């Protein structure tokens, strides 16, 4: 069963550059983490045509947005589905009250700060420029984050290598606020989309991924037409016959997943055997639960990797898991492509140890 799950999830995640366009890849996996270089590398893995300028172009064309979504992390999502994703995962304003109090913002101060921030974000503005414009506001960025959770402010990426952001008022960028969508209907839609991209999966997987309580996750999945293939693993009914006939993966396929890739973050702890053997989970995930950058061989995690830049040289360290052999020539070309995307003039790979 594990091999079938691995092959199926690899296909449904569109790994191996399975689709032509990054917009299609993004729709098929629902969302990718907004952080850079996670977002561009996640799209590079899944689309045949992706280069350094493509993500910026998608943002300027308003094809994608960066919004608080699953588990209140910031995700890059298709603009067309953003209202439903936002509505399904949005926290009520009272849930942010503690954060505002911690920043010294009562209701009146927050309302005043919102107005000031909106005045300064009619055009994209960097965080540093915003701080200069409102120098007396020590609580500024906390207020901006809560405004994003209200759908009033959006983030824009500026660099593929690092998470350098600009902020812009949603209404100024889109000419309107995000459409209001029904939260429950949106959650039911999200549950069905999740199973199509990440199934077969358990109720606890969807609850963990989405950040909603288990009872709400269960109720949302209860509205979907699914089959239980065993062990509580749910699959859309119309995918069952194709799932049962899926072919094993080529054992020599190679994929480089970035930190927080959609696939590594798609299932709860205890449900990740299709991606990584139980004995290696501690090498594939940080204690906090963050999915680490991984080298996949035949859809199975065999090493962790990290990188840093020295000028324009990209220095890569690959750390194979215990009792896993990964010849350098197996992944060298894949890292060259990552370096090309991130503007490296040279890529140097070294072996690491746990």
Q: PLM features: what roles do these ranges have?
A:
Residues 1-264, 268-272, 276-354:
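Long, low-complexity intrinsically disordered regions
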